[in-house]
Amino acid sequence: MAFIAALGLLMVGICPAVTYWATADGQLGGHTAVQKDRDHEIQLDSVTLASINTDFAFSLYKKLALENPHKNIVFSPLSISAALALMSLGAKGNTLEEILEGLKFNLPETPEADIHQNFGHLLQMLIQPENQVQINAGNALFIDKHLQILTEFKEKARALYKAEAFTTDFQRPREATKLINDYVRKQTQGKIKELVSDLHRNTSMALVNFLNFQGFWNVTFDPEDTFLGNFTLDRKRTVNVPMMKTEELTTNYFRDEEMQSTVMELNYIGNASFLFILPDQGRIQHVEDSLQPQSLRKWRKSLRPRMLDELSLPKFSLSQDYNLNDILPELGIKEVFSTQADLSGITGAKNIRVSQMIHQAALDVTETHTEADVITIARYNFQSAKIKAKIVKVDREFLYLILDPMFKSISVMGKVINPLTN
């Protein structure tokens, strides 16, 4: 199975004074020369960051689910939090506090410098080629050609967040729109074709954050075994959807009686993983209401290898976009969208606010073969774990999490209510 998630985040400041410059070759200054103890300390901090990101992810998911009832959901909490953290480099005062506290950081206990350092370390580790999964993440700022930025912001944005910048003539909104959309289309391998459609002449900055993920199942789903099966929408309705099927596999499995759901983990080559949360019929609202950071910790601690006779999953493709202007204020991030915003750390000017914040995400779940010897090893390692026949059908609404290969931070999260609805 091949999985691709492509995500774009746009911020536009309409007060005429925002820009920054950064190049694409920025690295995490200092990490290659640090001692092993310090590097180990950073990795431990990155695990803590992943836990904090889980809190943010679940809080944001609940807001999205409330705003989008009866709809499929797909978004990247990691992409959104990284973009907000990057923006906070230029924020001051209450604007800064709102952003970081909205991201679930406890500022008295967590120095701001540590937050940025660990975000940078996390993003850097994600894109390492030895991870085997293909992850491409970064930021781009499209800036008005008349504006100047502060050196400190420029250097930090480049070093910590892999930011690059493009001079843009926003007085020609059609050309500026094409420049941004062409960049996003290229970085997301064509999955997101139009992020911007209504740029105004008084726009001064557009910040794009992208996260592109491609992984290959560590199990085999033969396309010839895909069949049309029933997917239950509610008590009265079902739809016929393509169902991928595989047999005789070992996968991590946990029955959560408290949450009234089945949790199953499928791994990708390279140790990233796809977590299915399959509530009992009619209990998805209960699961959503119960989501807490400790929920993920409990699932990961409780998952055990289980031999399955058969597993069937829906084949689906999702694409959604969200206006975060309406959602982030409910998480406490308000001032940055108002005339009281203080983003003076970008240019030195205080007449800057964010007028538009858009998040688009696309997710494809399909079959992809992997090397046969991988499957053979998986099948023979745990033959003794099979006690009785076990068939798992993901044939009703479910939640899902994509966890990164190193720190198990939530890269992508969402819900499938109807696999046929894009």
UniProtKB/Swiss-Prot annotation:
The keyword Transit peptide appears for this protein: no
Keyword terms: Glycoprotein, Protease inhibitor, Secreted, Serine protease inhibitor, Signal
Entry annotated with the keyword Cell division: no
Subcellular localization: Secreted
S-S bonds: none
Segment forming the signal sequence: 1-17
Predominant cellular place of this UniProt entry's protein: secreted
Glycosylation sites: 218, 230, 271
Entries under SMART domains matching the protein: SERPIN
Region of interest called RCL, as start-end residue ranges on this chain: 369-394
MF terms in GO: serine-type endopeptidase inhibitor activity
Any one of the GO CC terms: extracellular space
Domain observations: The reactive center loop (RCL) extends out from the body of the protein and directs binding to the target protease. The protease cleaves the serpin at the reactive site within the RCL, establishing a covalent linkage between the serpin reactive site and the protease. The resulting inactive serpin-protease complex is highly stable. Variability within the reactive center loop (RCL) sequences of Serpina3 paralogs may determine target protease specificity.
Family designation: Belongs to the serpin family.
Miscellaneous comment in the UniProt entry for this protein: The single human alpha-1-antichymotrypsin gene (SERPINA3) is represented by a cluster of 14 individual murine paralogs.
UniProt protein name: Serine protease inhibitor A3A
Organism of this sequence: Mus musculus (Mouse)
Gene that encodes it: Serpina3a
